Amino acid sequence: MEKADIGLIGLGVMGQNLALNLADKGWKVVVWNRTVPGKEENVVDNFIANRAKGKGIIGSNELTDFVEALKAPRVILLMVQAGPAVDELMDKLLPLLDKGDILIDGGNSYYEDTERRVKELYDKGMYFVGCGISGGEEGALHGASIMPGGAQEAWPVIQPMLKSIAAKAEDGTPCCEWVGPGGAGHYVKMVHNGIEYGDMQLIAETYFAMKHLLALKNEQMADIFEQWNKGRLHSYLIEITSAILRHKEQGGGYLLDNILDAAGQKGTGRWSVINSLQLNTPLDVIAEAVFARNLSAEKNLRVLMSQHYMHVENHPVYNYQDTVAGLESTLSVSYTHLTLPTT
């Protein structure tokens, strides 16, 4: 049997989509997923029989068979939850691997953990790559922004694979480049996510100002965001904000009006803020975005506290044009903030 170019472990939606993307680009892929009775059963078989049917992807239910199915040097992409799960999987994998083999961690791992893993594998003659992947489920399937870093020796081997599945810039350049040694790839992804935290909080506050200060309707706000997306604020987040504002449910009401105002988070924004404190670097916009998420998650407390304050719907008179222009300028703060000189 023809051996695979790359193995992928972890068949969540991101893992499945990356496997399909790799296969579509002509790479031979083998996949494996753990079995957890009652939670994760027959994951590989179901993937091969359904989404991967006819794609030439090899499914393996045994880790030893998975490793044996790979050509040398073996390249294995880990798409598992960040944290102890990565180390536990490495403990199972390393005895099965040889010198020169490559592990790529495609999750949102903490960059200091990646630094440790790079050194651990390097001492064994193997190569570890911490790889930030941005773009979500759609990006994984159709083209993501990919930020690899770690053992430089791995780059010539994995570069063709990663660049083939990356998104393409307007000039056709793949959105994938070697970032640097150690945990550099995951560090850049951490900062990227921190900027996104700031962006999303600014968008949320802009929505609040439009709704409660300018008393605009959803369609009016959608029009403004759509116009902004044609200019300097052109971005995925601004584009989908306009689309979300317009989206109606089957009953005719707006979807946004029925969404619980409690934001979740996975930790990368918090890591960015902690690192900024360690470096004595101001990062107040992103820090406040993290605090805002913490506060929003306390829904019951906010409801309780609101009962102690009188809410008065009294809209001051604002100049519409000046206010909208000011809000547009505010939305660039996350990027401007990171270009300020530091000591």
Residue ranges and their predicted role:
Residues 1-61, 65-68, 100, 137-140:
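NAD(P)+-binding Rossmann beta1-loop-alpha1 motif at the extreme N-terminus of oxidoreductases
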Residues 28, 127, 282:
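Residue-level detector of anion-binding/catalytic polar loops
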Residues 6, 86-90, 110-223, 230-258, ...:
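Rossmann-fold dinucleotide-binding core
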Residues 52-113, 122, 140-150:
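Rossmann-like NAD(P)-binding element
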Residues 336-342:
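Conserved small/polar residues in nucleotide/adenosyl-binding loops
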Residues 261, 265-316, 320, 324-327:
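A conserved active-site cap/scaffold subdomain adjacent to cofactor or substrate pockets
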